[in-house]
UniProtKB/Swiss-Prot annotation:
The protein's assembly and partners: Homodimer. Interacts with PP2A5.
Transmembrane stretches, start-end: 92-112, 142-162, 190-210, 215-235, 257-277, 287-307, 341-361, 380-400, 466-486, 488-508, 520-540, 541-561, 741-761
InterPro entries: CBS_dom, CBS_dom_sf, Cl-channel/antiporter, Cl-channel_core, Cl_channel_pln, ClC
Functional note: Voltage-gated chloride channel.
Pfam family, one: CBS
Subcellular location: Membrane
Expression sites by tissue: Broadly expressed in the plant.
Protein's name in the database: Chloride channel protein CLC-c
Positions carrying Phosphoserine: 27, 672
């Protein structure tokens, strides 16, 4: 980890005469009274005690930081100078080729996901419908609950035993990754596998969840898999792929994958690009905009082609459903003053209900995390309990609704309908009657939204039905999110918002000129704005979903109002989840209290540094006894006249250098020999599988006493700030440049060349306010 604040490692004992040099150098760190540059520049109690673990999915695991900075050491410079024009062309071509493959793969996975959900859920609903027609109500309930329970258990088992990181929507984890946070299996192939099949089983099981969030995570996993740079273990290496053995290029690919996931889930290519820009990515530039747009365009073409292929009935029960496209185009959109007042009211209600939703989701997630920590069995039992409750609500609540006569003039056979999805479901009703609540609860979530968005259907749903459905979906959405299955928040939020939006439209009645289907859309927009706090991307996604550009001004208005109101209470749901999971996310702004501090005020822990030519045993022992990922390299006499900062060496590069055993018995510079014997690709980030560990090194006692020149692997141009720089400016600099390490140097000469190193953990509020509890967090 890049946390350099190992409180447990302050008392280091070194055994064996071979390592007496390290013991002598570390002794300066342990002696508060000494003045060497290897000592801590702060008192012992100035340690960073922020957590180095976080919740990823439904699992607690260690976290790392990513190296988004270009590491300009001698190997990088040599590789950059030696690149030919054809190699630069290959690199550019490969970026676009991988963007195409990400779009193609994500589109295929999105289609197969929907195909599976529609067929599994469709078979289940047809079975229930046939039993209800035969008035076998108990058998219908047990068949319904049993199918849901089996599917839910399958999804939970995959998450509990194969990839706990696949639980939840995955958007907070992807957002954290693009901010520079990595965790074990966050984008692993096993996570991708469970995300796909767990999402199919979970959505088909009738939970109030969506597949949109999991699709974002799925797209990111696909991008990560394609951008691994090959695998030596499975002999999947290719010379071109070496260009992507770094976090910076993988970050761009994963941004494309996240955008492709939204495009595949909503059939909203432009909305996918804007979602990645507004919510997911922490860094953006024009070149990335082009590639994400190209990726989502590929997704759109793939989905359109596959949907056309299925229109002739070649895909089983898959038809209009699944890849949701809600056509609420009802001609000219006319509205009066009462309509505008109602829209403002919808925005306010959406903001209040959305902030309350976020608050309750946070409380439920904290409770579920306690249960999930007890082991896989408890995760599965929790999923089963929520499944049974959801089945009881979906099957039991329609009995509270009254049977409604079919509308006059409707085509014969459409009311009540016999198919698996319709707005007119008979349930227990007599001939020529339908149960409106069953058409919302005993349906796939996509079809329920489609029914709520239906235009020119003012009286199809009773006011009491909409109220019952809203309360049920609101509560079930809260208690379902957080269980150990892949689950998204978009669909529950759209369902709840569309139901109360339609309810407001019904209450207005003849006073309003807007169709109730349009009120459903505006209600969904208000609730989305109140929970997720996005505006531009949500507006475009909703317009692409509904194919109704005439609603643009009203959707913009309701989103702005709901977001403004909700911001008065708390943060967006994904921001809250990131904080709750313990992910050290760097915001794009500095906190107000940071202006009262300077960089040196939060530098913590004992700083361990190396000489340019260092003894192998000293490096080995430092790597063994700490988890630091960055070590300052100091030029010392006789190589320079005075001690000066040479740069930073990464832990991964040190391990590769030690494994190569490019040592010397004399303490002399021999970096040119190392440059000739190694290549830049040898120091590239590991792809599939884990990189080198200190335990993998096999060094003899004789080798421990030898020396190694660290200059070839040292980033000689690290970002540095003066110790007197405002902490607020340091935080903004750290965030905007995507740094992992920020060196703090002294302002006055004659002191040690480096004061300390800042990492993202040093900017976390719990660390800063822990050091200075008297500071007002709001000032």
């Amino acid at each position: 980890m890049d946390d350099r604040h190992e409180g447990d490692h302050h008392d280091i004992e070194v055994e064996g005469g071979a390592l007496h040099g390290f013991e002598r150098k570390i002794s300066g760190i342990l002696d508060d009274g000494s003045v060497g540059f290897r000592q801590p520049l702060l008192a012992r109690n100035r340690k960073n005690t922020t957590s180095q673990i976080a919740i990823v999915g439904a699992n607690t695991c260690p976290i790392e930081s990513l190296d988004y900075e270009i590491f300009e050491n001698d190997f990088f410079k040599q590789d950059w100078r030696s690149r030919k024009k054809i190699e630069i062309l290959q690199y550019t071509f490969l970026k676009w080729a991988l963007a195409f493959l990400i779009g193609l793969a994500t589109g295929l996975v999105g289609f197969l996901n929907n195909l599976g959900v529609e067929n599994i859920a469709g078979f289940k609903l047809l079975l229930i419908g046939n039993l209800m027609l035969k008035e076998k109500y108990f058998q219908a309930f047990f068949a319904f609950a049993g199918c849901n329970l089996i599917l839910a258990t399958a999804a939970a088992s995959l998450c509990a035993f194969i990839a706990p990181a696949a639980a939840g929507s995955g958007i907070p984890e992807v957002k954290a990754y693009l901010n520079g946070i990595d965790a074990y299996s966050i984008l692993a192939p096993s996570t991708l596998f469970v995300k796909i099949f767990g999402s199919i089983f979970g959505v088909a099981a009738g939970f109030v969840v969506g597949k949109e969030g999991p699709m974002v995570h799925t797209g990111a996993c696909i991008a990560n898999l394609l951008g691994q740079g090959g695998s030596k273990k499975y002999r999947l290496t290719w010379k071109w792929l070496r260009f992507f053995k770094n976090d910076r290029d993988r970050r761009d690919l994963i941004t494309c994958g996240a955008a492709a996931g939204v495009a595949a889930a909503f059939r909203a290519p432009v909305g996918g690009v804007l979602f990645a820009l507004e919510e997911a990515a922490s860094w953006w530039r024009n070149a990335l905009l082009w590639r994400t747009f190209f990726t989502t365009a590929v997704v759109a073409v793939v989905l359109r082609s596959l949907i056309e292929f299925c229109r002739s009935g070649r895909c089983g029960l898959f038809g209009k459903g699944g890849l949701i496209m809600f056509d609420v185009n009802s001609g000219p959109v006319l509205y009066s003053t009462p309509d505008l007042l109602a829209i403002v009211f919808l925005g306010v209600i959406g903001g209040v209900l959305g902030s309350l939703y976020n608050y309750l989701v946070d409380k439920v997630l904290r409770t579920y995390s306690i249960i999930n920590e007890k082991g896989p069995r408890f995760k599965i039992m929790l999923v089963m309990a929520v499944s049974i409750l959801s089945s009881c609500c979906a099957f039991g609540l329609p009995w509270l609704s009254q049977c409604t006569p079919c509308p006059i003039g409707i085509e014969e056979g459409k009311c009540p309908s016999v198919g698996r999805s319709s707005i007119y479901k008979s349930f227990q009703c007599p001939p020529n009657h339908y149960n409106d609540l069953s058409s919302l609860l005993l349906n796939t979530n996509d079809d329920a939204i489609r029914n709520l968005f239906t235009s020119r259907s003012e009286n199809e749903f009773h006011i009491s039905t909409l109220a019952i459905f809203f309360v049920a979906v609101y509560c079930l959405g809260i208690i379902t999110y957080g269980i150990a299955i892949p689950s998204g928040l978009f669909i529950p939020v759209i369902l709840a918002g569309a139901s109360y939006g339609r309810l407001v439209g019904r209450l207005l009645g003849p006073v309003s000129q807007l169709d109730v289907g349009l009120f459903s859309l505006l209600g969904a927009a208000s609730f989305l704005g109140g929970t997720m706090r996005m505006t531009v991307s949500l507006c475009v996604i909703l317009l692409e979903l509904t194919n109704n550009l005439l609603m643009l001004p009203l959707v913009m208005l309701v989103l702005l109002i709901s977001k403004t109101v909700a911001d008065c209470f708390n943060r967006g749901v994904y921001d809250q989840i990131v904080t709750m999971k313990g992910l050290p996310y760097m915001e794009d702004h500095a906190e107000p209290y940071m202006r009262n501090l300077v960089a040196k005020d939060v530098v913590s822990g004992a700083l361990i540094s190396f000489s340019r030519v260092e003894k192998v045993g000293v490096i080995w022992q430092a790597l063994k006894m700490t988890r630091h990922n960055g070590f300052p390299v100091i030029d010392e006499p006789p190589f320079t006249e005075a001690s000066e900062l040479c740069g930073i060496a990464l832990r991964s590069h040190l391990l590769v250098l030690l494994q190569g055993k490019k040592f010397s018995k004399q303490r002399t510079t021999f970096g040119s020999q190392i440059l000739r014997s190694c290549k830049a690709r040898d120091f590239g980030k590991a792809g599939l599988g884990k990189g080198l560990k200190i335990e993998d090194l096999d060094l003899s006692e004789e080798e421990m006493e030898m020396y190694v020149d660290l200059h070839p692997i040292t980033n000689t141009s690290p970002y540095t700030v003066l110790e007197t720089l405002s902490l607020a400016k340091a935080a903004i600099l750290f965030r905007q440049l995507g740094l992992r390490h920020l060196c703090v140097v002294p302002k006055t000469p004659g002191r040690p060349p480096i004061v300390g190193i800042l990492t993202r953990h040093d900017f976390m509020p719990e660390h800063v306010l822990g050091l200075y509890p008297h500071i007002d967090p709001l000032k």
